[in-house]
């Protein structure tokens, strides 16, 4: 089987980021984003997606975390897009419901080649620690635009904003894991009647 890995470096005047992903990993993560809460969420993606994920980032955190969080989403999206290559033999679609105590989120993904995000979440507070919850949508928007996927994220219930966020990232990891799984019955086939994604 081909190695489904990718490494992407993104350098701008605002951020310097390197992301490495192995889709057939063991859920190991090496994370240094400079944003501790984001590292915690990225760890959920790796652990529940069973991806090996490395993120090293330096950003203009003296301004705020916006550029760093968004650009990590962009770079992760680019890495995923490279790792899935032509998408032959992939399941393509993935979905997951994940609870954490009172919180429950649903994530559905399609490796469609068409970027689209539906983000239906109302967080119960504006910050988690010192992390602005608006940046969660910015992360996923950056990811979607560069991974070229359709992504639906719905927080169905929750009172604790940390729990809401964590269920979203865990469900995302699990849905993505399902979508990138290879189906031996479709070994050399593109999972689309178009013949291309």
From Swiss-Prot:
Q: Which Gene3D superfamilies match?
A: Imidazole glycerol phosphate dehydratase, domain 1
Q: Which GO terms describe its cellular component?
A: cytoplasm
The record's Pfam families line, in alphabetical order, gives: IGPD
Which BP terms from GO are recorded? Answer: L-histidine biosynthetic process
Give the record's pathway: Amino-acid biosynthesis; L-histidine biosynthesis; L-histidine from 5-phospho-alpha-D-ribose 1-diphosphate: step 6/9
Localization, per the record, is: Cytoplasm
A GO term, aspect molecular function = imidazoleglycerol-phosphate dehydratase activity
Instruction: Read off the NCBIfam families from this record.
Output: PRK00951.1-1 (NF002106), PRK00951.1-5 (NF002109), PRK00951.2-1 (NF002111), PRK00951.2-4 (NF002114)
Protein name, please? Imidazoleglycerol-phosphate dehydratase
Write the lineage as a comma-separated list. Bacteria, Pseudomonadati, Pseudomonadota, Betaproteobacteria, Nitrosomonadales
Q: Which gene encodes it?
A: hisB
């Amino acid at each position: 089987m081909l190695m489904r890995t990718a490494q992407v470096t993104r350098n701008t005047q605002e951020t310097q980021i390197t992301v490495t992903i192995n889709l057939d990993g063991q859920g190991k993560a090496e994370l240094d984003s400079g944003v501790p809460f984001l590292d915690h969420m990225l760890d959920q993606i790796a652990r529940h997606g069973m991806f090996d994920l490395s993120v090293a980032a330096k950003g203009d955190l003296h301004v705020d975390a916006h550029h760093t969080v968004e650009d990590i989403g962009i770079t992760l999206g680019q890495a995923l897009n490279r790792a899935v290559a032509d998408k032959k033999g992939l399941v393509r679609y993935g979905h997951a419901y994940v609870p954490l105590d009172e919180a429950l989120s649903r994530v559905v993904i399609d490796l469609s080649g068409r970027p689209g995000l539906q983000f239906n979440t109302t967080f119960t507070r504006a910050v988690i620690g010192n992390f602005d919850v608006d940046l969660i949508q910015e992360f996923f928007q950056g990811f979607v635009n560069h991974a070229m996927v359709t992504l639906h994220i719905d927080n169905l219930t929750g009172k604790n904003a940390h729990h809401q966020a964590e269920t979203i990232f865990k469900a995302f990891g699990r849905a993505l894991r399902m979508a990138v799984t290879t189906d031996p019955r479709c070994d050399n086939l593109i999972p689309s009647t178009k013949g291309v994604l």
